[in-house]
């Protein structure tokens, strides 16, 4: 792709722990989120916006710059985090991806940061909670 090309690809991504087991403890959560964020920041094909979730799944918002393969990217992120945290973290196969416009970025970031409250009060976006796994 030429450096004169323009692409605006914003994605909301979610993936779950193996068997939806609550692997993401309050103790593990900050380290996991920092690990994922740092990997994204170091990747020149991605721009980090937000990460959040609850004990059995992660939500992530990022922008992607071509060329990229989302399936491969998510697989590498899940694999690297499992390797980093060992048996204390296992992921289910599959994921959910939803594209969104830049005008919705603020809302998506807020949705991700408010995951615990949204799940507690059941104020969820069906579209952003979709996931296809085992």
Indicate where each model-derived feature is located.
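Basic nucleic-acid-binding interfaces
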Residues: 1-134
């Amino acid at each position: 792709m030429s450096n004169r090309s323009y692409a605006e690809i914003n994605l909301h991504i979610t993936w779950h722990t193996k068997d939806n087991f609550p692997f993401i403890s309050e103790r593990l959560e900050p380290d996991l989120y920092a690990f994922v964020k740092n990997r994204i920041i170091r990747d020149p094909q991605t721009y980090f916006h937000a990460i959040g979730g609850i004990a059995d799944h992660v939500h992530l918002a990022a922008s992607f710059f071509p060329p990229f393969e989302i399936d491969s990217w998510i697989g590498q992120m899940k694999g690297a985090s499992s390797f980093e945290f060992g048996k204390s973290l296992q992921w289910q196969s599959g994921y959910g991806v939803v594209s969104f416009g830049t005008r919705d970025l603020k809302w998506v970031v807020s949705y991700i940061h408010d995951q615990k409250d949204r799940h507690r009060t059941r104020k969820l976006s069906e579209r952003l909670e979709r996931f296809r796994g085992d």
